Amino acid sequence: MATKLNVNIRTLLANCEELAKSEQNFWRLQKFIKSLDTMLAELEAMGDPQSVKRIPGYLERLQALKISTGYADVPGSTTKTPSQSSAVSETGENALKEIRQLQNSKYHNELRKELLQDSDALRRRRGADESSSSSGSANVQETSGENMNQAAKYYTNAQEKITEHMLSLTRNLKEQTETANRIIRRDTEVVSRSAGMADRNINSLGKEAEKLEQHSKKAYKCWLWLMIAFVIATFIGMVLFMKIMKKKKS
């Protein structure tokens, strides 16, 4: 209960201080200040330790409000009956609701004034624009038509350039593909010719090797027959020489 009452007092004090900035609201603040007196008296009667520390600050702010608005205390007893004490919170809440309604109505009035001022300025500006646009509407239409034509030409030229660029890229790609195919075919032919030549060389080398073997075998046989003939001739010569020498001695 004390916490809620503290919150209501702080909120009501802040709203009253905001309203006290304008002298036109002084007459409205009388009953709110009276409600604050009642709420502070109820808070003192509760005897809450935390609330007791805050009460002097509340009283200072309330006294400043009274001085600034010229509030006059109504004479009467400050003692409260139990029924009056139970109605303090309702009185504070009603005062808060009324202050909020006042603030909302004030904000609504200010917003309405701003909107009315903006609408008047818009009407004046629209009249000036209509007077100026009526004289230059033909020029605007002509310039807009020229701008549209220029934009269409620009986009047409851009599309043509893009198309030409794509065609040139396609031609270059086709030429490069054909060149690569020719190079690949030429390299394939060279490789196939080289493979054929290698096969032929291997075959010829095999044949030459066979011929060399045959020649070497023939040469070996010739030398062998020559050696045999030489040995036989030498043997015959020795026999003849020995017979001739015997005849001479005899």
Swiss-Prot record:
The chain crosses the membrane at residues 222-242. Residues 1-221 are cytoplasmic. Residues 76-92, 138-147 have a biased composition (Polar residues). InterPro entries: Vesicle_transport_protein_Use1. One of its GO terms (molecular function) is SNAP receptor activity. Keywords: Coiled coil, Endoplasmic reticulum, ER-Golgi transport, Membrane, Protein transport, Transmembrane, Transmembrane helix, Transport. It is found in: Endoplasmic reticulum membrane. One of its GO terms (cellular component) is endomembrane system. Residues 72-92, 117-147 are annotated as: Disordered. Residues 243-250 are lumenal. SNARE that may be involved in targeting and fusion of Golgi-derived retrograde transport vesicles with the ER. Required for protein secretion. Belongs to the USE1 family. This is Vesicle transport protein USE1. It comes from Drosophila melanogaster (Fruit fly).
